[in-house]
């Protein structure tokens, strides 16, 4: 029987035409409204260079940000979605703080059923539900809770400091990211999920293996993420999940079993899970956190702490490692703290370390863990003219604006010599600078990252013990200058973070015994600083 191909061809052409129209119908959006906009490629939009891995996502954000340097805001296309990128700092402050009620939400993940770990977490929640959950979680980050979690962090960090200082002579060249993610994994496991793991001794533990899979945004994971966020109808049609079901089930089962065990045995721990358990029956009818809700909140805490914080520590260690004067000044401050505290750093002492604070904040400025963040308009808001003499623009409900964090923090108008690592920018008052309108790493206003104090403390404690015990020296594999990875949308180094790890020689002739998994070694002792070793 002869097949009539014409109806099939016509149907295919029609589908392609409809899809093309759907992808390109918005590309006159900014031209109609008189707003300057960044060039685009049909379907891929203005971020095509990042999607095709020509440049990193951070560099894409910076290029868009710099395209119209005199404009308060500019347009660009996230695939086919028109987005207004806000450049003016006062306008950003107005949007995120004073007029927060116009922009209270992020674009949500249209995947609550497929991906509850993303769809139900605090970052994705909107409106009253976001307020309820944030108010529930906020007590987890009070000073008293942070002080309790600091003790857990310190024990993990001391073990990693000892591990670094006792590497065999033929294994002292190390890529930092692997070790740092193991540390953040162990800290989050105990502080959020209430379980103890040791990823140095057991690098194949399920918590670490599944956590690494869930938070590692390589090429395929990043594409899935952007499709779910920017093309939800495609995600629905293809049933795309960001997190593999087996991984999501592992974390949910872990939370369910932990809660059941605590209820049955009367176990109480100072962690986020305990805090959520204690809200049961107190939030009102239909508002209690389900096991799925609790897992989603614990997971987003894990997601931010595991990948983002480990990356922050890598960039900070990289800059300290390649800047000898910075390393010496930091180690002098660390040595003084250890001397004052009789070898056991306290929560208060680490919080009062001005130079360590400055190193962390300068690292966050140069390498923000999130290079851009969105806000969704829920009621019309008038933007001033983008240039003098131009018309104002009214952002309508369901339209989206972007905060170009990487662009702002690399702008010489905001930070002179922006590509130079200079902790002294933040030395005078680091805590005040963390909330400044030009340092958006953790956001600004009510939607500011709830876990920012935890993330900074987690990074500070590890860096404290690494540099107390070791010097980081550039090696043949150290990438100078650093090149950002083009694969995926997470900010990291293209060639890893390679350094030679050298135990510090504080006083010749004295040694201390260090025990690490599988062996005992002797290294030169740091006098009167680690009496517990």
Stretch-by-stretch model annotation:
Residues 18, 50, 83, 207-284, ...:
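Cytochrome P450 catalytic core segment centered on helix I
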Residues 121, 139, 390-392, 402, ...:
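Cytochrome P450 heme-thiolate "Cys pocket" and heme-binding signature region
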Residues 48-49, 142-144, 184, 243-312, ...:
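Conserved cytochrome P450 catalytic core segment spanning the I/J/K helices
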Residues 372, 403-430, 514-522:
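Conserved cytochrome P450 K-helix/beta-meander segment immediately N-terminal to the heme-binding cysteine loop
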Residues 2-118, 123-132, 152-162, 198, ...:
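N-terminal membrane-proximal hinge/A-helix region immediately C-terminal to the signal-anchor transmembrane segment
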Residues 324-327, 452-492, 502:
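Cytochrome P450 heme-binding "Cys pocket" and the immediately downstream C-terminal segment
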């Amino acid at each position: 029987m002869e097949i009539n191909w014409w109806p099939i061809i016509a149907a295919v052409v029609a589908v392609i035409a409809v899809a093309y129209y759907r992808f390109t119908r918005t590309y006159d959006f900014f031209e109609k409204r008189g707003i300057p906009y960044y060039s685009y490629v049909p379907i891929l939009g203005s971020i095509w260079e990042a999607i095709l891995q020509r440049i990193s996502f951070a560099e894409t954000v910076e290029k868009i940000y710099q395209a119209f340097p005199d404009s308060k805001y500019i347009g660009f296309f996230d695939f086919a979605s028109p987005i207004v990128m806000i450049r003016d700092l006062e306008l950003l402050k107005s949007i995120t703080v004073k007029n927060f009620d116009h922009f209270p939400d992020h674009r949500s993940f249209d995947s609550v059923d497929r991906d509850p770990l993303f769809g139900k977490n605090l970052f994705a929640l909107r409106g009253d539900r976001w307020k309820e959950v944030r108010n529930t979680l906020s007590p987890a980050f009070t000073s008293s809770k942070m002080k309790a979690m600091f003790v857990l962090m310190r024990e993990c960090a001391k073990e990693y400091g000892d591990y670094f200082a006792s590497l065999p002579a033929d294994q002292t060249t190390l890529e930092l990211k692997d070790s740092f993610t193991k540390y953040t994994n162990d800290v989050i496991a105990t502080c959020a999920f209430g379980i103890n793991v040791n990823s140095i001794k057991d690098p194949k533990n399920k918590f670490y293996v599944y956590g690494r899979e869930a938070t590692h945004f390589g090429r395929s994971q990043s594409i899935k993420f952007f499709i779910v966020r920017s093309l939800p109808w495609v995600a629905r049609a293809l049933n795309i999940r960001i997190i593999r079901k087996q991984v999501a089930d592992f974390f949910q089962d872990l939370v369910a079993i932990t809660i059941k065990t605590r209820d049955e045995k009367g176990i109480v721990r100072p962690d986020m899970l305990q805090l959520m358990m204690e809200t049961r029956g107190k939030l009102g009818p239909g508002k209690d956190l389900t096991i799925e809700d609790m897992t989603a909140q614990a997971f987003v805490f894990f997601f931010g702490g595991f990948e983002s914080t480990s990356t922050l520590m890598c960039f900070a260690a990289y800059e300290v490692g390649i800047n000898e004067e910075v390393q010496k000044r930091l180690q002098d401050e660390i040595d003084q703290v250890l001397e004052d505290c009789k070898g056991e750093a306290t929560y208060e002492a680490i919080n009062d370390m001005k130079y360590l604070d400055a190193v962390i904040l300068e690292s966050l400025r140069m390498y923000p863990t999130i290079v851009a963040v969105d806000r969704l308009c829920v009621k019309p808001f008038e933007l001033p003219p983008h240039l003098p003499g131009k018309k104002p623009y009214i952002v309508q409900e369901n339209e989206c604006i972007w905060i170009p964090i990487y662009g702002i923090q690399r702008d010489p108008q905001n930070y002179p010599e922006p590509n130079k690592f200079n902790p002294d920018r933040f030395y005078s008052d680091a805590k005040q600078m963390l909330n400044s309108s030009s340092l958006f790493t953790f956001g600004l206003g009510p939607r500011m990252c709830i876990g920012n104090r935890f993330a900074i403390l987690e990074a500070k404690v590890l860096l404290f013990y690494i540099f107390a015990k070791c010097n980081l020296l550039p090696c043949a594999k150290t990438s100078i200058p650093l090149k950002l990875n083009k694969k995926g949308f997470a900010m990291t180094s293209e060639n890893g973070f390679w350094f030679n790890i050298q135990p510090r020689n504080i006083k010749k002739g004295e040694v201390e015994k260090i025990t690490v998994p599988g062996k005992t070694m002797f290294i030169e002792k740091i006098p009167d600083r680690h009496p517990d070793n």
